[in-house]
Amino acid sequence: MPIIEQVGAREILDSRGNPTVEVEIALTDGTFARAAVPSGASTGEHEAVELRDGGERYGGKGVQKAVQAVLDEIGPAVIGLNADDQRLVDQALVDLDGTPDKSRLGGNAILGVSLAVAKAAADSAELPLFRYLGGPNAHILPVPMMNILNGGAHADTAVDIQEFMVAPIGAPSFAEALRWGAEVYHSLKSVLKKEGLSTGLGDEGGFAPDVAGTTAALDLIGRAIESAGFKLGTDVALALDAAATEFYSDGTGYKFEGSTRTAEQMAEFYAGLLGAYPLVSIEDPLSEDDWDGWAALTASIGDRVQLVGDDVFVTNPERLEEGIEKGVANALLVKVNQIGTLTETLDAVALAHHSGYRTMMSHRSGETEDTTIADLAVAVGSGQIKTGAPARSERVAKYNQLLRIEEALGDAARYAGDLAFPRFALETR
């Protein structure tokens, strides 16, 4: 029985140069593991709270308080617990914090311990993390949803939509999907250069040109796909993350592309995009608290496209359950740091799948070299993963881990491909 013997923590830097928490766990059998916690740029109001230091150091973003929470309170509370009883460990963390949003000890402190314990237990069992968490049937490799053009909070431009993604749905394997996405990414750089547009990068490795708006960005990506030798909609489809909470003003509406719009007008805009482009997925098309607008949008176009709830659900089983009851969205974005423990994340995924919702595993804009979400995507069979462009090592680390997993699975590996998007009708391709 692997027992937690030592717990350590330190402050490290994420991909945006901001501090984050890294936790190390040692077990009585000599097993050692570490986990690093990501951080978001566009965050939902209902997420688990990150504990930051305030003050002048690192512009107030230091995490020494969270590190001390691990060393002084969390560590002593979990030392002696059985590492392979993840639910027991995570419940101890939740109980110790005692707040609904993990604001006392910090979601960043709690998550670091939760993930490090899981990784240590997997190593102790001599199993890869995806197999330890997913069991013997974990074999589905996800479609990489590559954010190759950045806007919104991820780029300093006038583009309101936060992420423009390509999805290599027609590839025969994950390795080929990764190649296709990388080739489209490089093709887009050439297209942007020809148009005299910037090829500077946003937070997640995608290009951040200051283009006229949504359709202009989609047209550029369409050209890049075809210039790379692929068929738009058959080989490679498109997806969006609007992050609409970022341009929503309570009581006023959605300040989008030069005008203020209602939820109904935004729905009309998205419906128009579906008629013009092969879109398989739209994330956060409306604000996190616009439940009525979400329900109406889902009823209107939810049978034609995947509508992913990120800020509206924040990987929280309780909010997801409410959304399911109200007919909000048809897919869940999964971010482990939104809820703060691995167990709660797995519970949210299980609820989504049981209710007919798809799931998309996701990184954050402030990432590290930690590859846990790659294993988690295969473990839960999400069929989709969003972890940035095929650039910047903190993004590529996840893709490279998925290559290793596919290789390890051998003939048992199956790439999700277009089966990950059943609402994307054949006649639209």
Swiss-Prot record:
Xref: SUPFAM superfamilies: Enolase C-terminal domain-like (SSF51604), Enolase N-terminal domain-like (SSF54826)
Chain positions recorded as Mg(2+) binding sites: 241, 283, 310
EC id: 4.2.1.11
Pathway membership: Carbohydrate degradation; glycolysis; pyruvate from D-glyceraldehyde 3-phosphate: step 4/5
CC cofactor: Mg(2+)
Top-level taxon: Bacteria
Cofactor binding note: Binds a second Mg(2+) ion via substrate during catalysis.
Function: Catalyzes the reversible conversion of 2-phosphoglycerate (2-PG) into phosphoenolpyruvate (PEP). It is essential for the degradation of carbohydrates via glycolysis.
Family indicated by similarity: Belongs to the enolase family.
Name of the molecule in the record: Enolase
Gene: eno
